[in-house]
Amino acid sequence: MKEFKNKDYATEIRQKIPGYDVMLDVIFRGVLLRLAPGLKVDKVLALASQTDELNGLASLFPKAGVTVVEPSEAMLQELKSQVHLPQAEYLNSRFEEAVLPSAYQICSCLLVLQFVENPSLFLRKIYDSLSEGGLLILSFFSNQQLGYWKTLASELGANQQQVQRTYENQAGLMNSLSPQEVADMLEEAGFT
């Protein structure tokens, strides 16, 4: 998993990922809010999560233990200073190398998959970390919309040099994933 060290990441992501807050609203208020009453959740696994994501999970599952796996020490410290979850365990590790029990009812993996070295193995490890019937909350950046992204991110005020650099170096910065490729990898990992 790629390591991010920018403390302004939470602000910049909203400029770089058009619809970031809409994505969070759909996930937490549109889907999980409706599912939460019927779910028995004791443990949540959060991979490279941001403040709003952790707060959303904590508000829906206040009694659940949360394990946060983050490869960047700087980002992990930033999370700890902004999110106060007494029941949280914070691991400064790449998820691929973390030793975890296979007992999580929910795994949150938002905008991470495109940065991992081997997405298939990453998804398999997530599957193995979930309890039977566990829920994966997954979003990823698809290269199929890169031109649209460049225009919209620029219009939303993202740093022009960063946008252009990301656009030009997309293949070197992140995996090129299509929705169908991810669907196939999920199926291969065991998800239904």
Predicted regions and their residues:
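Conserved alpha-helix/loop element of class I SAM-dependent methyltransferases that forms part
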Residues: P18-K40
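Class I SAM-dependent methyltransferase SAM/SAH-binding core
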Residues: K40-E97
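Short alpha-helix
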Residues: G172-A189
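A short glycine-rich, Lys/Arg-flanked "PGG" loop and its adjoining helix->strand segment in the class I
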Residues: S120-L135
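Conserved class I S-adenosyl-L-methionine
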Residues: L135-Q161
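A short acidic, Gly/Pro-enriched loop at the edge of an enzyme's catalytic core
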Residues: E96-C107
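A short SAM/SAH-binding and catalytic strip from SAM-dependent methyltransferases
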Residues: Q105-S120, S142
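N-terminal, positively charged/glycine-rich alpha-helical extensions of SAM-dependent methyltransferases
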Residues: M1-A10
